[in-house]
From Swiss-Prot:
One function term, GO molecular function aspect: DNA-binding transcription factor activity, RNA polymerase II-specific
Originating organism: Bos taurus (Bovine)
Subcellular location as annotated: Nucleus
Protein name (Swiss-Prot/TrEMBL): Retina and anterior neural fold homeobox protein 2
Record's comment describing the protein's domains: The Homeobox transactivates the Ret-1 element in the presence of CRX and NRL.
Low complexity compositional bias, start-end: 1-10
């Protein structure tokens, strides 16, 4: 069976005909991963203005080493999130308490009865590590160290913790433990 021009898969859009080019694939951007510093600066700018002008966005983009268009899209997404939160808070009828991000269970938060051994060959560590609730503000020597004011607005706003943020939290935790159990 012979097909005349205008019949068959090429005519139905199944492939390019003679002298035609294949349709170009639409380019899709990879998801942008922001650093903790970038998120902090973007959040500070959002607190100052939900609708920054192009000059402010360009200045901020240069400061955080991002293209202006990424900053613009971040603000669009952040405003959408803000409106969504406002809707949820107004829908509940009461003023909602500020949301804290969910923090995964920390491996170093053990009940006070279990001694902490940093390495098996070093023997037992300090007398005991306080339980997580005590660590967050009421333990001896840790008064207020990890209270609600200890975290930056980026953490308070429900952003997921990035690797750098987790490293910073771990470093702060070690420093707090050093203050609680000073070396001899």
């Amino acid at each position: 069976m012979f097909l005349s021009p205008g019949e068959g898969p090429a005519a139905e859009g199944g492939g390019p005909g003679p002298g035609e080019e294949a349709p170009k694939k639409k380019h899709r951007r990879n998801r942008t991963t922001f650093t903790t510093y970038q998120l902090h600066q973007l959040e500070r700018a959002f607190e100052a203005s939900h609708y920054p002008d192009v000059y402010s966005r360009e200045e901020l983009a240069a400061k955080v080493h991002l293209p202006e268009v990424r900053v613009q899209v971040w603000f669009q997404n952040r405003r959408a999130k803000w409106r969504r939160q406002e809707r949820l808070e107004s829908g509940s009828g009461a003023v909602a308490a500020p949301r804290l991000p969910e923090v995964p269970a920390l491996p170093f938060a053990r009940p006070p009865t279990m001694p902490l051994s940093l390495e098996p060959w070093l023997g037992p560590g300090p007398p005991a590590v306080p339980a997580l609730p005590r660590l967050l503000g009421s333990g001896p020597g840790l008064q207020g160290s990890f209270g609600p004011h200890a975290f930056s607005p980026a953490f308070m706003d429900g952003f997921t913790l990035e690797e750098g943020s987790l490293r910073l939290l771990a470093k702060e935790h070690v420093q707090a433990l050093d203050r609680a159990w000073p070396s001899a």
